Amino acid sequence: MSAAKNININLKIWRQKNASSKGSMETYKLDNVSTASSFLEMLDQLNEQLINERKEPIAFDHDCREGICGMCSLYINGRAHGPDTGITTCQLHMRMFNDGDTIYIEPWRSKAFPVIKDLVVDRTAFDRIQQAGGFVSVNTSGNTIDANSIPVPKDDADKAFEAAACIGCGACVATCKNGSAMLFVGAKVSQYALLPQGKVEATQRVLNMVRQMDEEGFGNCTNTGACEIECPKGISLENIARMNREFLKASLK
């Protein structure tokens, strides 16, 4: 890895006061950005500059800054989470850019993710889908079976863990030409469909989650595969196929 250096960049950033107001791209110039800094640290630096200039800082989502929570959600130069692969926005570093580059930064674009302010969008649609069926029933009467005593085939356990890696960032929706949430819902359905603990609500779970997904206004899946490519956790399209099978079985019962 080459030594860190400072670069000067131009930024085209979407600014919007709220969901009901019109937004536009605004231009900013930022100098002396270390290539060792993260993308969000670069935005912090820009906001410090704006505050010193007595201007409104840019609103953007972030929390853990470790690629775990799924809060950071920026469309950078036409790609969800930016030009690198297998990472979230907070894991993107400025060494991916060159001196003099112009960087375009936009919020997630989806009817189901309305803009709250600037680069922050409302992703509570995902929460409502999860609440519709993303859970398992647990006996709390005192006769609970130890989870470790329930055998799970190794292959099923591995696939369940892979599905559970979904952090709900919404990159799949943002990058999909149809604004589909099938990869997210497929991962959540698969996570429980593969485990014996998830069999209790299996039928109602997939029906409820798919119905809620449709009510939220997400688009249909046309198997383009962009969601899998841009997913920072590498969630496989196999989960969509599994959800479709679960939905068909549940619909026929």
Where are these regions (language model features)?
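Ferredoxin-type iron-sulfur electron-transfer modules in oxidoreductases and energy-metabolism complexes
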Residues: 37-56, 104-253
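Glycine-rich phosphate/adenylate-binding loop and adjacent beta-alpha elements
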Residues: 76-100, 105
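Short strand-turn-strand beta-turns centered on an Asx-Gly dipeptide
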Residues: 14, 30-31, 76-78
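Eukaryote-biased recognition of intrinsically disordered, low-complexity regulatory segments
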Residues: 6-28
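Short, structured protein-protein interaction patches enriched in aromatics and acidic/basic residues
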Residues: 59-71
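Short, contiguous acidic and Ser/Thr-rich linear segments
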Residues: 26-38
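N-terminal mitochondrial targeting presequence
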Residues: 1-4
